[in-house]
């Protein structure tokens, strides 16, 4: 079973049901991976999502990634990649997969640049962050391609177009 805990700062209050959006994004991402069984597992797998401002994400990015600027999304996995497979044997009853943190200003700017609604872009970022929590990365080109393919599939199930498509003007 999956639980998605959402904490949104006031500047995210724009009429969007962020909790529903986050649950749908996390679920769609998980369904595209071999870890889809977690959605129906006896234990509780939790993903924590914080929707905050650029200043907080900037500070976290500087502290944990040594990058002195805000970024769109940060992911903090709490389970090592090689241990995810063994979660079915967990007797704890619950496991925190990790935290996903989005920066409002960066998200809004990027959505405007792409010509998509902020909620759609945030959905993409939550899918992306969820895949990181499940052990996926994009350091190497082949990893990036595999992760982007999973993102495309997950987003398509939510009715969202390919965010990586190259469009001609």
Swiss-Prot record:
One cellular-component annotation, GO: cytoplasm
Domain of life: Bacteria
SUPFAM superfamilies: Metalloproteases ('zincins'), catalytic domain (SSF55486)
Keywords: Cytoplasm, Endonuclease, Hydrolase, Metal-binding, Nuclease, Ribosome biogenesis, rRNA processing, Zinc
Keyword Nuclease listed: yes
GO MF, one annotated term: zinc ion binding
Note accompanying the cofactor annotation: Binds 1 zinc ion.
Transmembrane segments: none
One biological process term in Gene Ontology: rRNA processing
Pfam families named in the record: YbeY (PF02130)
Binding residue positions for Zn(2+): 128, 132, 138
Predominant subcellular localization, coarse grouping: cytoplasm
PROSITE patterns to which the protein is assigned, alphabetical: UPF0054
Needed cofactors: Zn(2+)
Protein location: Cytoplasm
Broad class of enzyme this protein falls into: hydrolase
Enzyme Commission code: 3.1.-.-
Role noted for this protein: Single strand-specific metallo-endoribonuclease involved in late-stage 70S ribosome quality control and in maturation of the 3' terminus of the 16S rRNA.
Alphabetized NCBIfam families for the sequence: rRNA maturation RNase YbeY (TIGR00043)
PANTHER family referenced in this protein's UniProt entry, alphabetically: ENDORIBONUCLEASE YBEY, CHLOROPLASTIC
HAMAP family reported for this sequence: Endoribonucl_YbeY
Family indicated by similarity: Belongs to the endoribonuclease YbeY family.
Name of this protein: Endoribonuclease YbeY
Source organism of this protein record: Rhizorhabdus wittichii (strain DSM 6014 / CCUG 31198 / JCM 15750 / NBRC 105917 / EY 4224 / RW1)
